[in-house]
Regions:
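A conserved mid-protein helix/loop that constitutes part of the nucleotide-sugar donor-binding site
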Residues: 167, 171-190, 207-210
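Conserved nucleotide-sugar phosphate-binding/catalytic loop shared by glycosyltransferases and other
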Residues: 2-42
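Short hydrophobic "strand-cap" motifs at the C-terminus of beta-strands
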Residues: 131, 150-153, 169-174, 178, ...
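Membrane-proximal helix-turn-helix segments that form the acceptor-binding/catalytic region
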Residues: 57-64, 96, 109-128
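Short His-centered aromatic/hydrophobic patch
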Residues: 73-78, 96
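Nucleotide-sugar donor-binding and catalytic loop/hinge architecture
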Residues: 156-168, 192-194
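Donor nucleotide-sugar binding/catalytic pocket of nucleotide-sugar-dependent glycosyltransferases
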Residues: 91, 100-101, 117-158
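Short, structured helix-loop element that forms part of the nucleotide-activated donor/catalytic region
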Residues: 2, 137-138, 201-214
Length: 214
């Protein structure tokens, strides 16, 4: 049987603008801009700013009461799960759905300027899963974190196949920075210097719509 729980995050988070709330907000903003708290000696400060201790205690209590066997999270939630893992009864798995660079090198996205936190908390998970051998290599090379590779399975098979002679590329995506639209367009421009008969069709919507169509 499959049971779906809809959890109201407001039950766990205090959003009132208290001095502590303002301090945590300031820490996150300063770190995102300058990386000043991205040091091992400041891990407790940055961790509390991202995921306050009182909030963590509420989540540990709730998750343990559910008697889960395994808890799986993705993206930035994997770091939070790592903070909870030592106090949870369940096995814990973090699973990233983008490349290493997409999580760590894109400004203000996912793990931007949080390398020291990752080094402390991701190893506390029972497993941390990445999508490719390149990601596994980079986590080990840059952060000395061991990961496990599981390639996303193909979710569907299409009976209709493209005609390679049509000279058209098709990209379907959200128009957001993290999807690498700028890299795609730069790559296509370089490609066209060698063969200008090809066409690139982009389907989607998002925050970068005006920049893409300009």
């Amino acid at each position: 049987d499959i049971k779906v729980d809809f959890i109201d995050n407001n039950e766990f988070v205090n959003r009132h603008h208290t001095p502590a709330f303002c301090w945590r907000y300031l820490v996150q903003k300063l770190n995102a801009k300058y990386g000043i708290f991205n040091k091992e000696k400041y891990n407790d400060i940055l961790a509390d700013a991202i995921f306050p201790k009182k909030t963590r205690e509420k989540w540990v209590k709730y998750l343990n009461e559910q008697n889960y066997d395994i808890i799986i999270t993705t993206a930035s939630l994997s770091l939070r799960l790592g903070m909870l893992a030592p106090e949870l009864n369940a096995k814990t798995i973090g699973w990233q759905h983008n490349c290493y660079a997409g999580y760590l090198d894109v400004p203000n996205v996912v793990f931007w300027k949080q390398e020291c936190l990752l080094q402390e908390y991701l190893p506390k998970l029972d497993r941390y899963i990445v999508l490719s051998d390149y990601d596994k290599r980079d986590y080990k090379k840059f952060l000395d974190i061991d990961t496990e590779v599981k390639i996303n399975p193909r979710s569907f098979v299409s009976e209709r196949k493209c005609d390679p002679k049509s000279k058209r590329f098709l990209m379907a995506t959200r128009f957001v920075y993290a999807k690498g639209l700028d890299l795609m367009m730069e790559s296509f421009e370089e490609f066209c210097k060698q063969d200008d008969e090809w066409q690139l069709d982009i389907i989607g919507a998002g925050d970068l719509w005006n920049q893409i169509v300009a």
